[in-house]
Design a protein with these regions (language model features):
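Short glycine/serine- and small hydrophobic-enriched flexible loop segments
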Residues: 65-73, 116, 164-171, 252-256
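Short, conserved catalytic-motif segment at the N-terminal edge
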Residues: 30-52
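Active-site SXXK
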Residues: 42, 53-84, 114, 229
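Structural recognition of the beta-strand scaffold that forms the well-ordered cores
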Residues: 33-36, 56, 113, 122, ...
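Active-site-adjacent helix/loop patches that line small-molecule binding or acyl-intermediate pockets
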Residues: 5-17, 99-182, 186
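Structured C-terminal helix/loop/strand segments within mature extracytoplasmic catalytic/sensor domains
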Residues: 1-28, 44, 52, 170-191, ...
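Active-site-proximal loop and beta-strand segments within enzyme catalytic domains
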Residues: 71-108, 124
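Active-site-proximal beta-strand/loop segments in catalytic clefts of secreted hydrolases
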Residues: 37-39, 87, 115-118, 126-129, ...
Length: 272
């Protein structure tokens, strides 16, 4: 039954998990926002989901998704080559900063660099080639309100927007084409995974971001019934583990409780 349970149908155990999450994020103003969404039913729990914060490298995810969807339409050539010049040198994350200038890379390679090692130079090269405004128009049609709005290659994000683009990634992946599988492989190949699933499983597709105190992650968790989890924070790299580990644990438990209850409700309907 592809129908979420109503608030009245939730049991006390699930309500306790929800209160635990709310209490966790109320502990500090640096615990900025989160959103959990069960992909199959749309059941959602959130905190501060519409408030905006600096994107850091999370913005590379909707950029990559946009480019692959445009490639599917024949509007982007993933084999086109762009030249890495000194103008794009960036001391932040990535691999191009260790490469020679005036070398050519395909759009496909640059997208992979932007997602897996989170290459800032690759991101800026792609943004300059394809344009923030085009990405803004694409995503606002899908319901986002913050990403790509500012005249910057970075900008702001909120938890709801991050959920929208990760759900788009999941839906695109389910078209099961060569391109959609290639794109998803970039996200599953990311080695840095602040958010996790049941028993600390790292079976996720994610894109995190860190800049100064801003520290975020947006992940598809490949549970038996997959879900999306987004956490946005100002905790910084040195202090993220408590918030992200505990949120992952409580959400995975809540998700399991939710599906156990849903299964039991369905059985009651079937058996009368």
């Amino acid at each position: 039954m592809k129908k979420e349970l109503s608030n009245e149908e939730l049991n006390d155990d699930i309500r306790l998990s929800i209160r635990t999450l709310e209490n966790l994020f109320n502990q500090s103003y640096n615990y900025f926002a989160f959103k959990y969404t069960d992909i199959y039913t749309g059941f959602t729990i959130s905190y501060n989901e519409k408030q905006e914060i600096f994107t850091a490298s999370t913005i590379k995810a909707p950029m990559a998704i946009y480019l692959y969807e445009q490639a599917k339409k024949g509007l982007v050539n993933l084999d086109e080559k762009l030249t890495y010049t000194s103008a794009y040198y960036n001391t932040g994350t990535g691999v191009l900063k260790n490469r020679e200038f005036n070398q050519d890379y395909t759009v496909r390679e640059l997208i992979s660099y932007a997602i897996i090692p989170s290459d800032n130079a690759a991101h800026n090269m792609l943004m300059d080639r394809y344009g923030r405004a085009n990405m803004y128009n694409f995503w606002t049609e899908k319901g986002t309100t913050s990403i790509f709005r500012n005249y910057s290659n970075w900008g702001v994000v909120n938890a709801n927007d991050a959920t929208i683009y990760m759900k788009e990634l999941y839906d695109y992946y389910n078209t099961d084409t060569e391109l959609s599988n290639e794109l998803m492989k970039n996200f599953t190949s990311v080695t840095f995974k602040p958010l996790s699933g049941k028993n600390n499983s790292k079976n996720t597709a994610n894109k995190s971001g860190w800049s100064g105190t801003a520290f975020h992650d947006a992940a598809i968790v490949f549970d038996d019934n997959p879900y999306i989890l987004v956490v946005l924070s100002n905790v910084g790299y040195s202090d993220y583990t408590y918030l992200f580990n505990l949120t992952s644990k409580v959400v995975s438990e809540l998700h399991e409780k939710y599906w156990n209850l849903k299964y039991n409700k369905c059985q009651e309907i079937i058996t009368g």
